[in-house]
Swiss-Prot record:
It comes from Lagenorhynchus albirostris (White-beaked dolphin). Core subunit of respiratory chain NADH dehydrogenase (Complex I) which is composed of 45 different subunits. It catalyses: a ubiquinone + NADH + 5 H(+)(in) = a ubiquinol + NAD(+) + 4 H(+)(out). The gene is MT-ND4L. Keywords: Electron transport, Membrane, Mitochondrion, Mitochondrion inner membrane, NAD, Respiratory chain, Translocase, Transmembrane, Transmembrane helix, Transport, Ubiquinone. This is NADH-ubiquinone oxidoreductase chain 4L. GO terms for molecular function: NADH dehydrogenase (ubiquinone) activity. The chain crosses the membrane at residues 1-21, 29-49, 61-81.
């Protein structure tokens, strides 16, 4: 395993631990999710380039499309929650409350 792969895996684990530790605010959770998805994109692109697997060349691009959709939905949810409640706490996202 090369040094680049190790750095990408460290970036993924740092983003994952950030998501687990700082989950009270929605903005920090979205930033950690974005870091995880971008490190997965880099890891997928490096793996496909190293293995010369031509059938999976579109997988990183599809992953980026899903990441863009996730970011757009997350930011729309952040705007909606901050306009409704005034804060971006994740505890305000409970839809079972009346």
């Amino acid at each position: 395993m090369s040094l680049v792969h190790i750095n990408v895996l460290i970036a993924f684990t740092v983003s994952l631990t950030g998501l687990l530790m700082y989950r009270s605010h929605l903005m920090s959770a979205l930033l950690c999710l974005e870091g995880m998805v971008l490190s997965l994109f880099i890891l997928a692109a490096l793996t496909i380039l190293n293995t010369h697997f031509t059938l999976a060349n579109m997988m990183p691009i599809i992953l980026l499309v899903f990441a863009a959709c996730e970011a757009a939905i997350g930011l729309a949810l952040l705007v909606m929650v901050s306009n409704t409640y005034g804060t971006d706490y994740v505890q305000n996202l409970n839809l079972l409350q009346c």
